[in-house]
Amino acid sequence: MEMKDILNRMLNHEELSREETRDIIVGITKSEFPEEQITALLTGLQMRGVTVDELLGFRDGILATGVPAILDCDRYIDVVGTGGDRKNTFNISTTSCFVIAGAGYKVAKHGNYAATSVSGASNVIKNHGVQFTDDIDKLNRSINEAGIVYLHAQLFAKAMKFVGPIRKALQFPTVFNLLGPLVNPSQPKCQLLGVANLDQMRLYNQVYQKLGIDYGIVNSIDGYDEISLTSDFKVTTNSYEKIFKPQDLGFEIAKPEEVRGGATEEEAKDIFDAVLENRALPAQKNIVLANAAFGIQVMEKGQKSIEECVEIARESIDSGKALATFKKFVEINRL
């Protein structure tokens, strides 16, 4: 593959095929292209917008060149946000994962260190003494015994390290910002994704339809890439598309300051702990319940009402099962 031919086609407003973008990733990992050409490619894609097939091809390439995580259970979910909403929320998706697991559903959480917030999923997990691993036996023990496994992105997506310096130098979002939710190395058949705007919701909706998985995509109308309860929020799934009010789930509207994750990693850790220990602010608990509930509904293939799923999530926290799940997870994965 000649990158100059790809760039010339893009200048002529041509789209790339899924196979071509897959091969681009493979070529990048083999150092076949100079940085200047990769920079031009990423800039051109960002200016015109990436197509569904192009995004899927990049995904295919990252998974093909990365380390797989083959789990010996069939049905599990990942709850993740695209990031980049610059709202610095507490670790809502990560906390929700332990609530879902505490309710008896299997979870394979894929995450990384913070990029635009104080504390990302990997920060809060590591700050509890957890050691990241790609050892498949340990990963399977975690999901089978604790009901949840954590997959630290940097151990699996080898292609990302090749483009890291270029992404940092560009100082604007690229197609790689869209790929994080799509490259979970365990390739879950269920996913709850939070996006920061409706354009992303439409894009991922088409991507998930092509992948054939069970999914829910959520966006708070005021710009959060999760259900923040600070405003109405939109949900798109395999079977419905609807705008909800917080009151529809029995929750009060939250204030923006109640969603924030604190100024330090330690403050973010304290909020995470408080939710699982059932001593958080009511708004913080409600936000996690809302996100966990839609994740549970995805796992149930939409067969349970969202009201039922909220109560399942609530019981996970109130009974102490979410906290017990987290403690078991830490015990298995301790440094």
Model region roles, listed by residue range:
Residues 81, 85-142:
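A generic, well-ordered mixed alpha/beta core segment in the N-terminal half of proteins
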Residues 40, 94-99, 287, 291-294:
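Short amphipathic alpha-helical face segments that pack within enzyme cores
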Residues 13, 72, 96-97, 176-179:
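Short, flexible segments with low predicted structural confidence
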Residues 45, 111, 194-197:
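Short loop or secondary-structure boundary microenvironments that flank
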Residues 64-69, 89, 104, 126-133, ...:
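Glycine-rich anion-binding loops and their surrounding alpha/beta cores
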Residues 23, 57-60, 95-98, 165, ...:
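Alpha-helical scaffolding segments of alpha/beta enzyme cores, especially the outer helices
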